[in-house]
Amino acid sequence: IYKTSKISESCINPHKNWHDVEEQYFNSPKQIIYIDNFLSDEAVKELRAFCLVSKVWNREYENKYLGAFSDRGFISPIHLQIAINLKQKLPKLFGQHKLGKFWAFKYDSTLGKGINIHADFAIHNLNFWITPDEYNNEKNAGGLKVYDAPAPEDWTFHKYNNINADEISKFLNDNNAHCTNIPYKFNRAVLFNSAYFHETDKINFTEGYESRRINITYLFGNRLVKKKN
């Protein structure tokens, strides 16, 4: 495990007006925004070093990407400080919601594709990218596609997280869901309603260990599930 250096100030960008970010989210008609220059330069450098050096990528998925999880080694003082700083700087968004799970995925686009369409069990989903832009071969792609129709409250986690993609597509079509496609950018965060269905956009990154696309996800709060009678 890479031992991260202590960050001298906030892990999230200390020069950004975070009150404006909160207002942008609350005024967004779809609860989908992106935040450029999300982490401080110091924090993103250390977090990237942690991801490159630490042997925490211990789960392989069908689409050939790897996962690392907070309860299986993907954790450091920086990981936790990011959550603390989010609560401090964006109290209206995160203050009342407990940090749930957080994880990272690493993709080799020569082997497979990204994550299939799904939703997550939380209130807010914060997803950010830490692989430098120089490795992304398609500058207007490689990011995240978010559909502005939340998973039904009476669907179980297994149903909206592992369901057949055809059934989700039918649900989105029936509900006239619009897709917001946020292109990949280094140190860009995407914040959205975690009940929204989302999937990885087409990825095309340069071959090589350091060039693999890495995204990190933090979940805040618990989504209410409607009990069946």
Where is each model-derived feature located?
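Fe(II)/2-oxoglutarate oxygenase catalytic core
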Residues: 1-189, 195-229
